[in-house]
UniProtKB/Swiss-Prot annotation:
The entry's keywords: Acetylation, Cytoplasm, Cytoskeleton, mRNA transport, Nuclear pore complex, Nucleus, Phosphoprotein, Protein transport, Repeat, Translocation, Transport, WD repeat
Keyword Phosphoprotein: yes
Protein name per Swiss-Prot or TrEMBL: Aladin
Biological processes annotated in GO: fertilization; glutathione metabolic process; learning; microtubule bundle formation; mitotic spindle assembly; mRNA transport; multicellular organism growth; nucleocytoplasmic transport
Modified residues (N-acetylcysteine): C2
Region (Disordered): 500-546
Biased composition (Low complexity): 534-546
Repeat region (WD), residues: 149-188, 191-230, 243-282, 285-324
UniProt source species: Mus musculus (Mouse)
Gene3D superfamilies: YVTN repeat-like/Quinoprotein amine dehydrogenase
Tissue: Widely expressed. Particularly abundant in cerebellum, corpus callosum, adrenal gland, pituitary gland, gastrointestinal structures and fetal lung.
Loss of function: phenotype: Female mutants are sterile due to delayed oocyte maturation and meiotic spindle assembly.
Pfam families, alphabetized: Beta-prop_Aladin
Length: 546
């Protein structure tokens, strides 16, 4: 089992992590371009430093025009209709109970009794699921994979699965799309785009972006050849379902066929067919909501975490699930191995990393998840004291988020801020991992940013062919991309897998660069290469029964 006592000391104060070479993290006084030996392997990504000052938070403001008109007392039935659309049944009962002389006394009394009963039922339900008493903004902040979601200027970050393009959701609920091959930065805004909690690019598609919002899901379709920096709201498709708000998690199937959505206040997972704007709810037998969804890279399983001390794994053929209860709290974060046969996760309140294996079944057990009965501990993140050039420092605590690079050889863990550790700043731990023949988890180093900058979000580039590329969003508004140069032990030239590996089609398949949907990038700028002497396999489309 790996422990923090095996980690090398953190970089000296004032130093920033630049890249990894020869299994060691290289630091410098400031962010700079890679050394000449590595510049041929670098991606020309934009340098971003988005400050918080020009951004406002419209999600917390009233966008209505009600304040622009002189107050007029409407009839009670009109007020009830307005309240029904804004609040629901509880608001209608409250409006009638507090009306003056517009309704019969017995109607007001009945509504008052109904309000009291609703209050008792809500109190009982809230005692079972305390998170349901939180506001929408607080719900999102509680379960977001970014630290300090409420006030950070960079709320969500999402790489495109196939190109050097990423989207960033900002504090003002706008979304900017950056492309390494273009200087045009589209800014996406929509009247329903409030409290953005998640972004998800559609696989095998050039420019379809799903956005999880306060009251709906927006599907933006962007023209890669357009020169416009403000796409029309007509480019956005609206998906909504009663009771499914706020939407906090989205997950596309690796073949792009289905979109899953989840909300902490809704006990069901919705499986969307975006083309027809229809959805099918996955059966759920316990309330409490779903906080996070994560599809395995092979498309066979889906991790669904909940606000309670249990998480579920669904299999994507017959859509059955298995549940794993935890002892101390809910599942905080998780990530899949590239082959989908191992799940790493952490539990709220514990400084441990668990591993859950899913042995691959060869033609048997279809319709069953088939995971191990219990998880094993693979890393202990408990606080410990390490020696540094500046003296002794404490390191460790709970993990906030965790990401595994697509090659399966680097694992990054974003720790929660602790006043007794690193002056309360979140720390990024980097591990070396290996899945075969046995699972190994070894310490690599500690990633450090500029003085005063706190790491808030981490993610890996999905198709960096020289090792791994870790993107970090900092509290200062800076987005840094840290290359981790290594030779993939399994594939010397990394080739991403869009599902289970398959034999090339009869007659030979074309290179993935020749797929028409990736016209926005030139072949020379593609971030991966096929294996030498081998054409890329066609993506696998798992057949699902809903």
């Amino acid at each position: 089992m790996c422990s923090l006592g095996l980690f090398p000391p953190p970089p000296p104060r004032g130093q920033v992590t630049l890249y990894e070479h020869n299994n060691e993290l290289v630091t410098g006084n400031s962010y700079e371009s890679p050394p000449p030996d590595f510049r041929g392997q670098w991606i020309n990504l934009p340098v971003l430093h988005l400050t918080k000052d020009p951004l406002k938070a419209p999600g917390r403001l009233d966008h209505g025009t009600r304040t622009a008109f002189i107050h007029h007392r409407e009839q009670v039935w009109k007020r009830c209709i307005n309240v029904w659309h804004d609040v629901g049944l509880f608001g209608v009962l409250n409006e009638i109970a507090n009306s003056e002389e517009e309704v019969f006394e017995w109607v007001k009394t009945a509504c008052s009794w109904a309000l009291a009963l609703c209050g008792r039922a809500s109190s009982l339900h809230g005692s079972l699921f305390p998170h349901l008493s939180l506001r929408s903004e607080d719900l999102i902040a509680e379960f977001a994979q970014v630290t300090n979601w409420s006030s950070c200027c960079l709320r969500v970050f999402a790489w495109h699965p196939h190109t050097n393009k990423f989207a960033v959701a900002l504090l003002d609920d706008s979304i900017r799309v950056y492309n390494a091959n273009s200087t045009i930065v589209p800014s996406l805004k929509h009247r329903l785009q409030r409290n953005v909690a998640a972004l998800a690019w559609k696989p095998l598609s050039a420019s379809v972006l799903a956005v999880a919002c306060q009251s709906c899901i927006l599907i933006w379709t962007l023209d890669p050849t357009s020169l416009s920096t403000r796409p029309s709201s007509g480019c956005a498709q609206v998906l909504s379902h009663p009771g499914h708000t706020p939407v906090t998690s989205l997950a596309w199937a690796p073949n792009g066929g289905w979109l899953l959505s989840a909300s902490p206040v809704d006990a069901v997972i919705l499986v969307w067919d975006v083309s027809t704007e229809t959805c099918v709810p996955l059966p759920w037998f316990r309330g409490g909501g779903v906080t996070n969804l994560l599809w395995s890279p092979d498309g066979s399983k889906v991790l669904a975490t909940t606000p309670s001390a249990v998480f579920r794994v669904w299999e994507a053929q017959m859509w059955t699930c298995e549940a794993w209860p935890t002892l101390s709290g809910r599942c905080q974060t998780g990530c899949w191995s590239p082959d989908g046969n191992r799940l790493l996760f952490t539990v709220l309140g514990e400084a441990l990393i668990y591993s859950l294996s899913f042995p691959e079944r060869c033609g048997t057990g279809k319709g069953h998840v088939g995971g191990a009965k219990s998880a094993t501990i693979v890393a202990d993140l408990s606080e410990t004291t390490i020696q540094t050039p500046d003296g002794e420092e404490r390191l460790g605590g709970e993990a906030h988020s965790m990401v595994w690079d697509p090659s399966g050889e680097r694992l990054a863990v974003l720790m929660k801020g602790n006043p007794q550790v690193q002056d309360g700043n979140p720390v990024i731990l980097l591990f070396r991992t290996r899945n075969s023949p046995v699972f190994e988890l070894l310490p690599c180093g500690i990633i450090q940013g500029e003085p005063g900058a706190q790491a808030q979000l981490i993610t890996f580039h999905p198709s960096f062919n020289k090792g791994a590329l870790l993107s970090v969003c900092w509290s200062t508004g800076r987005i840094t991309h840290i290359p981790l140069y290594f030779v993939n032990a399994q594939f010397p030239r990394f080739s991403p897998v869009l599902g289970r590996a398959q034999e090339p089609p009869a007659g030979g398949g074309g290179s993935i660069h020749e797929v028409p949907l990736f016209t926005e990038t030139s072949p020379t700028s593609a971030p991966w290469d096929p294996l030498p002497g081998q054409s890329s396999a066609q993506p696998h489309s798992p057949h699902s029964h809903l």
